[in-house]
């Protein structure tokens, strides 16, 4: 009989998958008897950080000594929830698929909501950011909108999601136009939306790559509007209300259809969605069949607007007075370029402009890759000079 070893789990994919894995790992820590298990965070450990049980088990993939100290004597497991039969047959959620694989279950079981633990600094930073935006936009209620999932790409002037999980640009612009007069609209996106000018009712587009700070903003916002992406999982973990629009994926798999605080608008079901076996086959036939399932007509757009208004209620002017946070002399944000003479901290969450659609400098991962490439070029130049 094979000797039982402690396990090391490699978790890949985006932050949404990480959040959905949390309930299964909580169960594993409670039930398995494995006190020394390891979670290797191939996609980053942002949402294991601060967790009262899981943080001590979680490591970034670049952690010094990871292999010798935490992997060599363990059985290696790479969970892939999309390949669980109950998942691709729409009998369980992403979190439950993780649970089946990580805990070796034969049947689907109910799980608690994911746990995201924000500390005092994170919580107040998010609150302050929301208050600043509300005061500048003169609105008393904030709506955070995440229009895109990870599969969206920019092709020239167009933003395209080949998997049809994100909002179509024209649709989300129309929705924003109907809501911006009532509420403080905050767009959670790495790619810039072509938001029309409106001096009286501006839209905030914070340039903030830190997802934990976005989580703190969602915690302080009055409502969340999104698609099949990380924001809805953050909203669930923080017990917030959400309107979620779904196209090519299926609500039972990727969202929370039994939660009264979630209004799921399933556009894909109305348009004959065909399940796409993500991470199983490379055939694009399903994506082609689903190519138009997120394209909304005016009636669909109005359903989204009405849903947000139902949760938010009547919008008013900002009440009270915003008190800015006193700036510190030391910057601890690893995403900032501290050697830049123009490096400032005046607006911690980026500018609030009429249409802040300037391109970002790149994600943290992209910037690090660029820095590594630059160092490599410098090293090669030094070798050339020596020769």
Labelled PLM ranges:
Residues 328-350, 368, 372:
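Histidine-centered metal-binding segments
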Residues 318, 322, 330-331, 347-352, ...:
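Hydrophobic/aromatic hotspots within intrinsically disordered, low-complexity regions
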Residues 364-379:
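Basic, mixed-charge low-complexity alpha-helical segments
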């Amino acid at each position: 009989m094979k000797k039982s070893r402690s396990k090391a789990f490699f978790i890949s994919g985006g932050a949404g998958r990480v959040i959905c894995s949390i309930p299964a790992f909580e169960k594993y820590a409670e039930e398995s008897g494995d006190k020394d298990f390891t979670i290797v965070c191939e996609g980053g450990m942002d949402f294991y950080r601060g967790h009262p049980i899981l943080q001590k088990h979680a490591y970034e993939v670049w952690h010094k000594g990871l292999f010798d100290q935490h992997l060599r004597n363990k059985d290696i497991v790479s969970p892939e929830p999309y390949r669980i039969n109950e998942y691709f047959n729409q009998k369980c959620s992403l979190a439950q698929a993780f649970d089946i694989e990580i805990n070796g279950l034969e049947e689907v079981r109910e799980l608690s909501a994911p746990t995201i633990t924000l500390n005092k600094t994170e919580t107040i930073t998010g609150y302050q950011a929301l208050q600043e935006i509300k005061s500048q936009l003169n609105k008393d209620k904030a709506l955070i909108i995440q229009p895109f999932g990870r599969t969206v790409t920019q092709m020239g002037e167009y933003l395209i999601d080949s998997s049809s999980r994100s909002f179509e640009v024209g649709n989300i612009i129309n929705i924003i136009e109907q809501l911006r007069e009532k509420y403080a609209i905050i767009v959670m996106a790495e790619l810039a939306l072509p938001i029309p000018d409106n001096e009286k009712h501006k839209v905030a587009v914070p340039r903030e790559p830190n997802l934990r700070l976005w989580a703190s903003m969602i915690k302080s916002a009055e409502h969340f509007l999104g698609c099949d992406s990380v924001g809805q999982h953050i909203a669930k973990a923080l017990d917030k209300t959400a309107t979620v629009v779904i196209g090519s994926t299926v609500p039972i798999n990727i969202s929370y259809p039994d939660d009264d605080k979630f209004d799921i608008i399933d556009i894909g079901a109305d348009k004959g969605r065909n399940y796409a076996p993500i991470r199983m086959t490379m055939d694009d036939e399903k994506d082609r069949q689903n190519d138009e399932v997120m394209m909304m007509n005016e009636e669909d757009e109005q359903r989204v607007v009405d849903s947000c208004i139902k949760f938010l209620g009547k919008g008013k002017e900002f009440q009270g007075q915003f008190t800015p946070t006193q700036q510190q002399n030391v910057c601890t944000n690893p995403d900032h370029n501290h050697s830049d003479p123009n490096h400032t901290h005046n607006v911690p969450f980026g500018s609030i402009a009429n249409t802040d659609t300037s391109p970002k400098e790149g994600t943290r991962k992209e910037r690090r890759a660029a820095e590594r490439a630059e160092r490599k070029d410098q090293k090669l130049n030094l070798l050339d000079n020596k020769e």
